[in-house]
């Protein structure tokens, strides 16, 4: 049924099928499909012809997207962009899986990390973009496109959009810049802040920094037991494992924690608001990049146009300033603002040399085992 | 000659109640029974390395839960916290319920309404508000430092006590209302009879009021226990490492590792545990007591 539907939808989009026949087919299919998700999905697809859905992180990021990309796009094409939000990657992926098979419910998403791209590809949610229809892709750093090409050499299913770092935020009232620089990743194990330490609840970041603390390459950990031991040592020192960016900012602003792993953009927001928070990017700092991923089943003509709008310098720069993460635009090709040049993780060369990103295959292969083990370690076992 | 098909012998079925119930039954079937069946089916499936699910029929997910003490220990913690929460709600809830019952004030209805007031505010907001009260820079620490009682902020957040505080704030009204309704149902003549037979105030309470209010107490305890066992927000927002409860574990498995089959298996185990408790309660005490709190007399 779904294969047939996809064929019919493809024929309709190619112009080989009239709208009347297409809708007629949907009606017949709806009757045949029964109760389990069928008719709801079909009606959704039928209604989706004049719109495309984009899911992002909300807040100032979505505002910038709406103002500089979605609204001009709707004015130019008449296609409405339905602006959805998510709290984190995993819960969004859960929703996407729940909507499987794809085709109408979710279209574009602001995914975090190359490993997420690999996860979506692994689940066969990817599509094949035509780069010739996304002119502004030429303005993007090649160093940011390359990791995606390695995963899907035949065709991209996403365009890189911004980059950032998960470094260490510390309160300068309690920890001097000199001390932070001197200790590096070891700051997260410093006994003087026992009980006032924070960390993200996510498994990957904790293992990454424990690898740095134990003198190992996070993308090639040789002694995982040393990592678990380091994390066991750290657990009693941690006051709170935060679960969202809002909680991270609250913990730092209220001085509940004096140091924590932190997202560079969130720290930049706190600094802008006048909080005495420093940001440390130690050697081996966890760098990541975000992309706009196009789901399987999306109308690619519309997606190409929208991606081009979003990569246009005025939109990309505005979004970057809104969310405080440098854009994927190559600084040697596009003149960026002073505000962006001063953001953490900004690379004026556009080459990203010295930036350490998570190896998607390495981390995804170990996700189930390590995430479960991390739960135990965090529980003090 | 057969007579079984004669209309006179056919049992009459009254379809009216079923017709009236059909919208509710349909909603329950579609929104509760079918999703639960999905969860049960998922619990026998497998997780692919990518996070996709593989249809299968095997008990590996259940075996995994019991194969070492890590997962059962979280279940035991959940039961322990739930029982502790029941005890605290009972102690803290009986007194105000009794006070409302005995009150002759013209503000009595308004006071009862105050019990319902927290329901008008989002549960998340109510839970988050404890951070501003108990935090290092929160109201309580600020006040204690201001009056010179402490020189350093006390660590009041991100522990089991904070979780219990959040749970009690959420669940106390359920306990109070159940006990209050039970007390209201007691025939006042019984108390007068007890007094006329020489009982003092305390004896009358101990011999008459308390025993007759026990159905309300047990209904409140059941409701608080079941709601606590399935709660997710207070441990997440107010708890620290090691304060996770079973609902948080289910969230981590389903959302964090995309392990839907194992998350479903844990959900089924929780469902069976709570179902057994409710069934036992209904078997010996009757479930109808629960509805009285929401119906009044």
Each predicted region: which residue ranges?
Chain A
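A ligand-binding cleft/hinge motif common to bilobed small-molecule-binding domains
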Residues: 116-119, 253, 259-276
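Early extracytoplasmic/lumenal segment of secretory-pathway proteins
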Residues: 49-118
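Periplasmic-binding protein-like
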Residues: 228-234, 242, 271-296
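Mature extracytoplasmic/periplasmic domains
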Residues: 47, 290, 295-358
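C-terminal segment of N-terminal export signals and the immediately downstream linker at the start
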Residues: 16, 38-58
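Extracytoplasmic ligand-binding site segments that recognize negatively charged/polar headgroups
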Residues: 59-66, 89-90, 110-253
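N-terminal secretory signal peptides
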Residues: 1-21, 44
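N-terminal export signals
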Residues: 15, 21-43
């Amino acid at each position: 049924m779904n294969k047939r539907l996809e064929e019919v939808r493809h024929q309709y989009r190619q112009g080989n099928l009239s709208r009347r026949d297409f809708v007629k087919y949907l009606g017949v299919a709806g009757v045949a499909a029964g109760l389990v998700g069928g008719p709801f999905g079909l009606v959704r697809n039928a209604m989706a012809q004049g719109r495309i859905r984009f899911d992002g992180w909300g807040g100032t990021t979505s505002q910038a997207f709406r103002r500089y990309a979605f609204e001009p796009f709707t004015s130019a094409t008449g296609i409405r962009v339905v602006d959805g939000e998510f709290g984190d990657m995993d819960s969004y992926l859960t929703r996407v899986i729940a909507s499987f098979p794809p085709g109408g419910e979710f279209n574009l998403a602001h995914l975090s990390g190359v490993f997420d791209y690999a996860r979506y590809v692994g689940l066969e949610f990817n599509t094949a973009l035509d780069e010739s229809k996304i002119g502004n892709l030429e303005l993007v750093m090649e160093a940011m496109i390359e990791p995606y090409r390695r995963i899907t050499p035949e065709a991209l299913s996403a365009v890189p959009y911004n980059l950032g770092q998960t470094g260490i935020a510390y309160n300068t009232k309690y920890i001097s810049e000199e001390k932070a620089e001197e200790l590096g990743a070891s700051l997260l194990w410093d006994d003087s802040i026992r009980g006032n330490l924070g960390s993200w609840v996510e498994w990957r970041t904790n293992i990454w920094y424990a690898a740095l603390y134990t003198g190992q390459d996070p993308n090639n950990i040789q002694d995982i037991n040393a990592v678990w031991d380091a994390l066991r040592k750290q657990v009693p020192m941690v006051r709170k494992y935060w679960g969202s960016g809002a909680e991270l900012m609250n913990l730092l602003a209220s001085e509940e924690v004096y140091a924590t792993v932190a997202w560079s953009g969130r720290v930049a927001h706190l600094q802008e608001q006048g909080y005495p928070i420093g940001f440390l990017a130690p050697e081996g700092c966890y760098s990541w990049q975000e992309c706009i991923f196009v789901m399987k089943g999306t109308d690619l003509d519309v997606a190409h146009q929208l991606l081009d709008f979003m990569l246009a310098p005025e939109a990309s720069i505005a979004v970057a300033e809104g969310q405080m993460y440098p854009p994927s635009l190559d600084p040697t090709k596009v003149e960026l603002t002073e505000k962006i040049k001063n953001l953490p993780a900004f690379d004026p060369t556009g080459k990203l040399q010295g930036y350490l990103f998570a190896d998607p295959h390495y981390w995804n292969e170990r996700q189930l085992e390590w995430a479960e083990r991390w739960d135990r370690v965090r529980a003090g076992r | 000659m057969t007579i079984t098909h004669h209309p006179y012998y056919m049992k009459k079925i009254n379809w009216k109640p079923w017709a009236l119930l059909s919208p509710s039954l349909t909603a329950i079937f579609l929104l509760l029974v079918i999703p639960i069946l999905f969860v049960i089916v998922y619990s026998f499936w497998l997780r692919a390395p990518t996070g996709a699910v593989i249809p299968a029929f095997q008990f590996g997910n259940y075996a995994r839960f019991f194969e070492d003490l890590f997962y059962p220990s979280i279940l035991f913690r959940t039961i322990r916290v739930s029982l502790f929460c029941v005890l605290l709600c009972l102690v803290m809830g009986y007194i105000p319920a009794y006070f409302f019952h005995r009150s002759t004030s013209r503000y009595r209805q308004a006071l009862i309404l105050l019990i319902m007031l927290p329901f008008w505010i989002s549960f998340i907001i109510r839970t988050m508000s404890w951070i501003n009260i108990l935090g290092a820079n929160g109201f309580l620490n600020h006040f204690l430092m201001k009056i010179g009682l402490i020189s350093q902020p006390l660590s009041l957040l991100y522990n089991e006590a904070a979780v219990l505080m959040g749970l009690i704030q959420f669940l106390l009204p359920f306990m109070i209302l159940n006990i209050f309704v039970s007390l209201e149902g007691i025939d006042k003549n019984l108390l007068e009879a007890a007094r006329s037979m020489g009982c003092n105030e305390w004896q009358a309470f101990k011999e008459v009021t308390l025993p007759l209010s026990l159905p309300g107490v047990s209904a409140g305890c059941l409701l608080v226990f079941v709601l606590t066992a399935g709660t997710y927000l207070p441990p997440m927002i107010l708890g620290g490492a090691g304060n996770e409860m079973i609902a948080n574990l289910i969230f981590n498995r389903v959302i964090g590792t995309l392990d839907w089959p194992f998350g479903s298996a844990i959900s089924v185990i929780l469902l069976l545990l709570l179902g057994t408790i409710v069934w036992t309660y209904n078997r010996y005490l009757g479930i109808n007591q629960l509805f009285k709190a929401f119906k009044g007399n």
